[in-house]
Amino acid sequence: TGRPLSTVIPTEGRGAVRVEARPIAEIQNAASRYMKERGIDAGDGYDVTGYPELNKDRARLVAAAYQQMKDDPTNPAVRRAYEALIEETLGQLRALDKTGIELDFLAPNTPYPYGESPAMGYGDIVTNKRLVTFPTRSGYGTGTTADDFEVANNPLLRNVGRVGTMDDATANDAFRVVHDAYGHFGPGNPFFRSKGEERAFLEHRRMFSDDARPAMASETTGQNSYLNYGPDEIFNTTASGETTKYAPQKIGIMPDWATDPTGMPDGAELRRLQKIVNEWRKANG
């Protein structure tokens, strides 16, 4: 199907403009240097140069797997995966800092500059070498903020010090920055619906170790599959960023097949998950 060549981005005072969705060299070079330093093989067997057609049936099964995933922050395997995710996220952030791109966070009571479309961040980087991120403390899921969760039960809410313009950022703030940079904007993927989010998962997944990938998958393809193909699929198809019904925040890891971009469940697990999907379809009419 090929990667889209352009996207329409709203602009202040000029309506909307169509821009070519090219990779951003500074970010791509930072990603390559990081992987080389870490000894990570960028060619892990999955083609991320194109824009593969999304398998919606599989995405619905991933959504069901995310729903069934236990919120299990004290599980040693879960803890190890999230600790690896955080450590590697901070390493990726240091690599991004060297690009000279200004990493800003939205100040309280300030209009979000990408409110009309998150794709506006692409133009901001290309034109102004700036990326603005919505802080975790201002929104973390549907109708909740970071203050609604206990840090002891969510390692992503741990304070990691200064990130960009924020002195007391959380690990989740750092992950939001690097995922937008390395998953979306750097590869020329300023798309934030289901296909763009899955491609961001494929792009950014390459930069993580096997230890971190299960947690990274829960935070990306797990949550995004639930958002786009879970129980609120019909509502979210036309919802704005403010009205979208997001996935519940959980600290856990999905089955191995769900973290593998081409994996599929089978046997009793497939039947159990398909039953959940069928119930969603029935409820949505």
Regions found by a protein language model. Name each.
Residues G2, G39, G100, N236, ...:
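Short, flexible coil/linker elements and helix-boundary hinge sites characteristic
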Residues G2-R162:
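Glycine-rich short-loop/terminal segments
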Residues G2-R3, T7-V8, E12-R14, Y226, ...:
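Compositionally biased regions
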Residues I86-L90, K98, L103-G241, Y246, ...:
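Core of folded catalytic or high-affinity ligand/protein-binding domains
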Residues G230-N284:
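Charge-dense, extended regions
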